[in-house]
Amino acid sequence: MIKIKSKWIKIFLLVLVVAAPAAAKPFYDGYSEYRKNAVPVLEYHSVGGSDEWPAEVIIKTEVFEKQLQYLHNNGYSMLSMEQMIDGFKNGKDMGKAVVLTFDDGYMDNYTNVFPLLKKYNANASFFIVQSKIGKPNYMGHDEITELIRAGNDLASHTINHNILTDIDPKYFAWELSSSKFFLKKEFDMYYVHLLSYPNGKYDEQVIAAAQQYGYNYAVTGKNGAVDKNWVENHPMEIGRVIIKGDMTESEFESKLERSYLLGYLKSVVFGSLFFY
């Protein structure tokens, strides 16, 4: 996979606007069309957890609610991964939509997030570290079951959150296949086929193993909205917009907007080339 750093995106746009004005209109026309059915996938972790945790994994509950308010007030539907995937499969007009995802399975996803999902008529996908179920600060069987019954997704974040690109491939079966098995067994044969790579780290070998063990879709830490074409052709590399706890409201809005442009460049202009 080729990675294109953000500075090259800026250079590309500058060249497009300044040196090739004739190409600008088709570009922006295509971008406008892309936006109609592109969906940013938002990545969260803890909501309202310990202030000692880094901003990458925690956001204050009141900040999270302001983000939901912004999305609701601006006409966004807030979906789970399954709802987005089904919408793309069935040719649904997605309109303005985002997907909400939560990694790790923290208890505050139940105590703080779940009530707000119900308040704003939203759904989400919860990527669970299987070995953490029922441990201190993590959701247990009853909490996860209630989330599922409310229409949210149960998904895998592996057994132990080991970084898959850093471990011996002989352990892939344990981290990937066993996670599916135990989640399915504990939650009434729930169909687990969504994966979040720990720390967003993956490579071609990890993708092949995940598909071998029955995962149909996986989310990464690479920015950019996704459309039907991307999800169909790159189901194991669905990018997400990482939402950090120290973001201001304007930064959240800007990052959401920027994800459409990054997704368009990735999906339409650069094809299968990646950047971050």
Question: Could you describe each region identified by the protein language model?
Answer:
Residues 127, 157, 218-220:
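Short beta-strand and adjacent tight-turn residues that come in two discontinuous sequence segments
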Residues 136:
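Core nucleotidyl-transferase/polymerase catalytic module
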Residues 106-107, 160:
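Short, glycine/acidic-enriched loop or turn micro-motifs at the edges of active sites
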Residues 132-133, 141-144, 148-169:
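Histidine/lysine/aspartate-rich catalytic loop segments that bind and position anionic ligands
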Residues 2-6, 21-101, 107-108, 166-276:
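C-terminal active-site subregion of NodB/CE4 polysaccharide deacetylases
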Residues 114-121, 139-155, 229-231:
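Acidic (Asp/Glu)-rich catalytic clusters
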Residues 9-16:
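Sec-dependent N-terminal signal peptides
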